Regions:
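N-terminal Rossmann-like NAD(P) cofactor-binding subdomain of oxidoreductases
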Residues: 19-217, 253-255, 279, 288, ...
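Oxyanion-binding "anion nests"
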Residues: 220-266
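Conserved glycine-rich beta-strand-loop-beta hairpin in the small C-terminal domain of fold type I
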Residues: 266-272
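Short hydrophobic/aromatic beta-strand micro-patches
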Residues: 274-276
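Short, conserved charged micro-motifs
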Residues: 279-287, 348-349
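A common structural junction motif
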Residues: 285, 290-300
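A glycine-rich dinucleotide-binding beta-alpha-beta segment and adjacent secondary-structure elements
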Residues: 297-323
Length: 366
């Protein structure tokens, strides 16, 4: 129902991140495999590679047996979907995974053993000390440390950290509080369909029983649909953001508090972010840093009450940042609050992965 929306919203390119010279055994026109090609992120892998001019010698579309024999479109040609097996990677240079943690844990090592470099969108390897966890705007230099697998961070972490990083570089952030407003796209195509269908049923006065989400989705919001740690009270999504922030920033001392909420929005996550720096920080300083930060676009019009919104972030590569203001609860002048929005399927997933793949060897891009 909403699958066409995935590609239709992929329109605007972000500022280019200039690749550094990196020695990798990847050909100029690599064979690229996509695992999970029929999913929401898989569709965006294809669209993102196409519009960014990513050179591909051959595309291998991999999915489960039930999708085998179907086709996907790539650069005007139909590519037949193959069933994912242990022999799928024999001739592959780069593999983009977005089929869930269990699939990644089983097949990513097989792909690496066959000679492929893996960029994995699941949480399977993110906290493995030997696996780089990369946001290219922040730590592209870590790509060269890979041993075959590079992890794509959590979408909520990416959304917050891209604009926080330039501030952290100039004035160390010692504490950050994040409250998320996460769209259906983060739970996949089936969740997006359920939001549309349940909204229609609700408007027509019909009963709708949730099949994907744990609670009614239309005109409702609820705590992120991941398991709750009975001791801390934090859900898995919140814990991921905390741990990944520290790993990506390479700062175990940074204090992170997170509350993750699922909202009835089709696509694009929003987050309220308040951070405290070691030294005093002003709104003007933050604006100046963000104005030249790669992957960031300031949307902050107080006169018109116009700030980042999901409808504007959908299809955008940049993280939108607005509501930049002093945190009045901190009289020391060390804290700033802001509101951010980003397309979860793009910068939160597919775009970030493709940016990583672009940086493997400089010669991958024309």
């Amino acid at each position: 129902m909403v699958r066409g929306f995935f590609v239709a919203c992929s329109m605007v390119r972000s500022r280019e991140i200039m690749p550094k010279e990196m020695e990798q055994n990847v050909s100029n026109d690599p064979v690229v495999a996509i695992v999970g090609v029929t999913g929401a992120v898989g569709a965006e892998f294809i669209a993102t590679m196409d519009r960014r001019g990513f050179r591909v010698g051959k595309l291998k579309a991999l999915a489960s047996a039930r999708s085998s024999g179907k086709t996907v479109s790539f650069r005007g040609e139909r590519v037949v979907i193959e069933e994912l097996t242990e022999h799928s990677f024999d001739d592959v240079d780069i593999t983009l995974f977005s089929a869930g943690g269990s699939i990644s844990r089983k097949f990513a090592p097989i792909a690496v053993k066959a000679g492929a470099v893996v960029v994995d969108n699941s949480s399977a390897f993110r906290m493995d000390p030997s696996v780089p966890l990369v946001i290219p705007e922040i730590n592209a230099n870590r790509i060269r440390d890979h041993k075959g697998i590079i992890a794509n961070p959590n979408c909520a972490a990416i959304t917050a950290l891209v604009p926080l990083w330039p501030i952290h570089q100039k004035n160390r952030i010692k504490r950050v509080i994040i409250s998320t407003y996460q769209a259906a796209s983060g739970a996949g195509a089936a969740a997006m369909d359920e939001l549309v269908e349940s909204t229609r049923a609700n408007l027509n006065g019909q009963l709708y029983t949730p099949k994907v989400m744990p609670h009614p989705y239309a005109f409702n919001l609820f705590s992120h649909n991941t398991a709750i740690d009975p001791e801390t009270g934090y859900n898995d999504e919140e814990t991921k953001v905390i741990k990944e922030t520290r790993k990506i920033f390479e700062d175990d001392r940074i204090a992170v508090g997170v509350t993750c909420v699922r909202v009835p929005v089709l696509r694009a996550h929003c987050e309220a972010v308040t951070f405290e720096c070691e030294k005093p920080v002003s709104e003007d300083q933050v604006r100046s840093l963000l104005a030249v930060a790669p992957g960031v676009k300031i949307v902050d019009d107080r006169a018109k009450n116009y700030f980042p919104m999901p409808v504007d972030a959908s299809g955008q590569d940049d993280v939108l940042v607005g509501r930049i203001r002093k945190d009045l609860s901190d009289p020391s002048g060390h804290s700033i609050s802001m509101f951010v929005a980003a397309d979860q399927l793009l910068k939160g997933a597919a775009l970030n992965a493709v940016q990583i793949a672009e940086l493997l060897p400089e010669r991958v891009m024309a």
